[in-house]
């Protein structure tokens, strides 16, 4: 399994509309990427560090795909459409990293 890990760094003065992100952007992403091996997503709202400091990231989202090839195809075909929606929920430039799941506990 492959994950696209999208991280939104904390930036002073920036905005992030979690309601829009959860209610509009992610369902749109799911619909647009369904035919490209999209399996689901997990959203994490970063609130603090273990030591109680401010977190480095505001939000981390992991989108799961069947394969890297399908992820790449989906981004090639639908990436521009998804990116065009970013400004509706944030002005933060996301950091996207592809990861491969090599172990998982349940």
Language-model features: where?
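Macromolecular interaction modules
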Residues: 1-106
